């Protein structure tokens, strides 16, 4: 098994607040529990994880060994534009964390009720192969969520209002060093707002 794959899985479990024991890791990676236990022990011997009461946590060495990508959005109606963007973001690193906008954020930004609840949107995104962890964002402040995740790369969708320079400056103010990438899309016409208007 590739160390980066295991480290990315352990990182994602940590971000989601899940216990990263051998059973949970085995289920996530499709291993037998004893294989997962061996993976964890090997990573501990290499100084990449520490085992605390049977649960693995990445050390700074382990965290530096993987590239974490962060992307955020409303993701109300998952369409091909979203899937393309998520897939492109995933290719930038070893682990992809997707931050899902709160229902209250959707109400403020779009002036209407969310089409799908925040919990259902997290569950839906979690089911995508490219997504290592889907989490709820913090209302009104992307930087609180960024400080929790501590990504190496922030991937912005082609139509997101955040500006690359602004994100980089604000992150730096908070002690984060990260790269900001604006993703393109061959499907700029596919948008949730447009789909809703056509219904």
Go through each PLM region and give its residues.
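Nucleotidyltransferase catalytic core that binds NTPs
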Residues: 1-199
């Amino acid at each position: 098994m590739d160390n980066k794959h295991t480290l990315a899985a352990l990182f994602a479990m940590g971000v989601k607040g899940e216990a990263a024991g051998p059973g949970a890791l085995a289920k996530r990676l499709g291993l037998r529990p004893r294989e997962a236990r061996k993976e964890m022990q090997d990573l501990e011997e290499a100084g990449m994880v520490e085992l605390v009461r049977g649960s693995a946590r990445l050390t700074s060495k382990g965290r530096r060994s993987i590239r974490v990508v962060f992307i955020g959005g409303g993701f109300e109606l998952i369409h091909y534009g979203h899937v393309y963007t998520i897939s492109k973001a995933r290719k930038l690193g070893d682990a992809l964390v997707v931050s899902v906008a709160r229902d209250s954020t959707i109400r403020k930004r779009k002036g209407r009720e969310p089409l799908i609840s925040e919990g259902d949107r997290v569950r839906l995104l979690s089911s995508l192969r490219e997504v290592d962890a889907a989490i709820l964002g913090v209302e009104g402040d992307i930087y609180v969520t960024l400080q929790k995740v501590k990504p190496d790369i922030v991937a912005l969708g082609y139509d997101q209002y955040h500006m690359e320079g602004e994100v980089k400056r604000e992150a730096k103010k908070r002690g984060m060093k990260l790269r900001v990438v604006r993703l393109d899309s061959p499907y700029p016409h596919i948008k949730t707002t447009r789909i809703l208007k056509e219904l």
